[in-house]
């Protein structure tokens, strides 16, 4: 007599667990911060309200392609991810997602995002977002990351593009003010990642990734972080100098820059443990709050 069909608890849980693995591959927290800068780029491009179509489909399409870039990063880095304490639990090293499925997911997400931008936003934004995806997934992850200690500096341009993508989503054209926002994120990227690289120096050395602390030492990297935070503080003043922002942004960005410089100074000249991760975490709040202040100031200033 045939046994009645039954569904085990492991079977019922496998599907949601599978989707959580795909969701994790898109690096949702990173994409969320990136989409904040996209939104600010959209809002600063216009004096009034942002039209709903480019707002909704721009954020959706750019977010999908950013998630695809992150998934490609998981795919390309799966070997070294399995050897590093920070990343060994990711879906691919743990076998929660196969290589074939990860590749299919990444390509599908990228294609859907591109089609969405191309048809419902504009061609310029679609192609710029595609170029940013290639810059991060191919140029940075597949080549620069393993080739030079300046990987973050050179490859950081792809990660600095979101405000420009937001700007072009609602205007369909380049503008110098959008490039100022790109410069800010470009200057922010090295100290952000170098602080993490100091904390994870031994792991990067283990997998032969030539991060700056591995190739040039921790003290040299601390000096570079301090110098870049000063450069970032100068870059943050550029929107004020061109009349793009008002007094609220000037005060807010100055306070944030002083805080970042202080944390970097402390990292350089104090040997307390855990300072590198403090700088890394502060840098995330710095960028998030800076763009929120940009947004609030824009509507008050207008």
Swiss-Prot record:
It catalyses: heme b + (2E,6E)-farnesyl diphosphate + H2O = Fe(II)-heme o + diphosphate. The chain crosses the membrane at residues 30-50, 52-72, 102-122, 124-144, 152-172, 178-198, 224-244, 245-265, 282-302. Pathway: Porphyrin-containing compound metabolism; heme O biosynthesis; heme O from protoheme: step 1/1. It is a multi-pass membrane protein. It is an enzyme of class 2 (transferase). The keyword Cell membrane applies. GO terms for molecular function: protoheme IX farnesyltransferase activity. One of its GO terms (cellular component) is plasma membrane. Its EC number is 2.5.1.141. It is found in: Cell inner membrane. Keywords: Cell inner membrane, Cell membrane, Heme biosynthesis, Membrane, Transferase, Transmembrane, Transmembrane helix. Gene3D superfamilies: UbiA prenyltransferase. Carbon 2 of the heme B porphyrin ring is defined according to the Fischer nomenclature. This is Protoheme IX farnesyltransferase 1. It comes from Shewanella woodyi (strain ATCC 51908 / MS32).
């Amino acid at each position: 007599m045939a046994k009645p069909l039954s569904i085990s608890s492991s079977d019922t849980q496998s599907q949601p667990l599978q989707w959580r693995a795909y969701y994790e591959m898109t690096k949702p927290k990173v994409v969320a911060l990136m989409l904040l800068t996209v939104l600010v780029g959209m809002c600063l491009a216009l004096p009034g309200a942002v039209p709903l179509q480019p707002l909704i489909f721009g954020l959706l399409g750019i977010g999908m392609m950013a998630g695809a870039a992150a998934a490609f990063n998981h795919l390309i880095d799966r070997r070294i991810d399995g050897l590093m304490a920070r990343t060994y639990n990711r879906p691919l090293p743990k076998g929660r997602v196969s290589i074939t499925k990860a590749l299919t997911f990444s390509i599908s997400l990228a294609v859907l995002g591109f089609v969405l931008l191309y048809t419902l936003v504009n061609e310029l934004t679609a192609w710029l977002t595609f170029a940013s995806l290639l810059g991060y997934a191919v140029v940075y992850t597949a080549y620069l990351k393993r080739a030079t200690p300046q990987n973050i500096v050179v490859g950081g341009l792809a990660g600095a593009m979101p405000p420009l993508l937001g700007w072009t989503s609602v205007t369909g054209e380049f503008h110098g003010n959008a490039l100022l926002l790109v410069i800010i994120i470009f200057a922010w990227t090295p100290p952000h990642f170098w602080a993490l690289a100091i904390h994870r120096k031994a792991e990067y050395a283990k997998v032969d990734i030539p991060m700056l602390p591995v190739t040039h030492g921790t003290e040299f990297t601390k000096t570079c972080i301090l110098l870049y935070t000063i450069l970032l503080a100068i870059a943050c003043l550029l929107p004020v100098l061109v009349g793009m922002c008002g007094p609220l942004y000037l005060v807010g960005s100055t306070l944030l820059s002083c805080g970042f410089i202080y944390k970097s100074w402390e990292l350089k000249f104090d040997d307390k443990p855990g300072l590198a991760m403090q700088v890394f975490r502060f840098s995330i709040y710095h960028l998030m709050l800076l763009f929120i202040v940009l947004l609030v100031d824009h509507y008050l200033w207008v």
